[in-house]
């Protein structure tokens, strides 16, 4: 029996006050609907039907080439009408799981529990008990068994007292679903085709109906405006921060961290406030991340330290290496064991050898730097000739004086010393001292020009 997931994502989201389709608004740098798609894949879905309408071009541009079947809902006539558009793509023996593109925090474990709760050839509904159920459809039971769902606007005073609400998420057998969808009517206060009406049909047909509930109600909350979107963002961040702490990270303040990707941490990791993680980030044991740092698609080995306000993107730090404060490591940067990149140093597509240091105010691009090298302040690898990038090689134990320019392609041999202020345009041999600065001149009794008053 195949698992066929239908994701409803056709709405405009007028209350967002945006040209962007509602489901494309982001949670943690990823659209709400992408969160739902990823969760659907994670539970082993065999097919995903994405029901779309408003903003089709933007949806397709955002979601790109994924394993999705695009199903158009030209008119938004209710949830039942939306699911009905996917009927041609549903086999009789499918288990159909219905999800919503604006409910991004639903967890795989909850959906697995819902599927497990579905009786054979029956229906399972995800429900939540709320202290204030206003605005939601109510679960109607008789002698404990579900017999229907009544929408808020159609409920009588007695039904309005029910606090078990419908989340809209349900698992339904394919053959019966298609039959029930064909029998839906829009004879209700909204004039819409309610998906929820199939529950009363299931009861009337003698089909077993069971329910499951999420671990937290926040999983099934949607975002209809930017206030609710921000609330979901904070809930997501709190959940991700908790995962990090349980995995061995110490967060100075769990409320001041942004996780916008996949973060893996070792033991005894220390993360200060206002740190942002994006993409895939791996932190080893005893790693320290300073306040305000931004880490994007990088790997930080045991004992390494990222000091405050550094940006680490597409880079690797070896054991006990350090960067910052205010350092920038760009894609292709790699710091070997005990290497140090200090404040206002930028490294791009360069390897910094074991124990090598660039303490401050330098640019190291397209370079291979050996072990035990000292890079003075103001050093620049001049890697670009206006058309192509060229490589600078600095071998082991080289001392580069401050304010040195290395015009690539160039190689500096082992143990060489480059005097401060030099511009190096040719290869330097091992253990050589090279100084290229202009000879200092002294003009005695020099008189400065005098300003002329206007």
Swiss-Prot record:
Keywords in alphabetical order: Acyltransferase, Cell shape, Cell wall biogenesis/degradation, Cytoplasm, Magnesium, Metal-binding, Multifunctional enzyme, Nucleotidyltransferase, Peptidoglycan synthesis, Repeat, Transferase
Pathway: Nucleotide-sugar biosynthesis; UDP-N-acetyl-alpha-D-glucosamine biosynthesis; N-acetyl-alpha-D-glucosamine 1-phosphate from alpha-D-glucosamine 6-phosphate (route II): step 2/2; Nucleotide-sugar biosynthesis; UDP-N-acetyl-alpha-D-glucosamine biosynthesis; UDP-N-acetyl-alpha-D-glucosamine from N-acetyl-alpha-D-glucosamine 1-phosphate: step 1/1; Bacterial outer membrane biogenesis; LPS lipid A biosynthesis
Region annotation Pyrophosphorylase: where it falls in the sequence: 1-226
Segments of this protein annotated with the region Linker: 227-247
Binding positions (acetyl-CoA): 377, 383-384, 402, 420, 437
Enzyme Commission code(s) on record: 2.7.7.23, 2.3.1.157
Stated role: Catalyzes the last two sequential reactions in the de novo biosynthetic pathway for UDP-N-acetylglucosamine (UDP-GlcNAc). The C-terminal domain catalyzes the transfer of acetyl group from acetyl coenzyme A to glucosamine-1-phosphate (GlcN-1-P) to produce N-acetylglucosamine-1-phosphate (GlcNAc-1-P), which is converted into UDP-GlcNAc by the transfer of uridine 5-monophosphate (from uridine 5-triphosphate), a reaction catalyzed by the N-terminal domain.
The name this protein goes by in its record: Bifunctional protein GlmU
Gene: glmU
